[in-house]
Amino acid sequence: PLVAAGGWTDVASGVEQVTALAQNLTAAIEDEETEGRIVVVVENLNEYLQGPADKPLVDLIKAVKKSSHTLVADADTAAWGPTWPLLAEVKSARRGLLLQPDASEGEILLKTGLPRVQRSELPPGRGFFVARGKFVRVQLPLVLR
């Protein structure tokens, strides 16, 4: 889990903590006097579907999309398929990083066709950054500690 990576200003795990932090972050993002930029990272987003954290997370995502702050949401590809409001809100931005995607995943997830590539051309950390229907191939670094 990303929680173990450290370096976060605030961390929540478990539905109650996630719900509370989502509400606090929404208030901070909507407050024009908040200084700096906030990056919100949600790991395993699909774990919060149809639970107490669902609506607060939808509100948070909407607030981030209307601001200059950043959202990073993580889930397995299969989890992005259903059209729950929480997932739809993230996908509607049509911006994302798809690592080792199948050709169809760009269309399914971000409404952007991706080129067919051999699996060997997409080692760990390689994929496509997609924004507003355009894509670029990217390679993320492997950080060793």
Please annotate each region the language model reported.
Residues 1-95:
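P-loop NTPase catalytic phosphate-binding loop
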Residues 5-8, 81-145:
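Phosphate-binding and hydrolysis-coupling loops of NTP-dependent motor/remodeling domains
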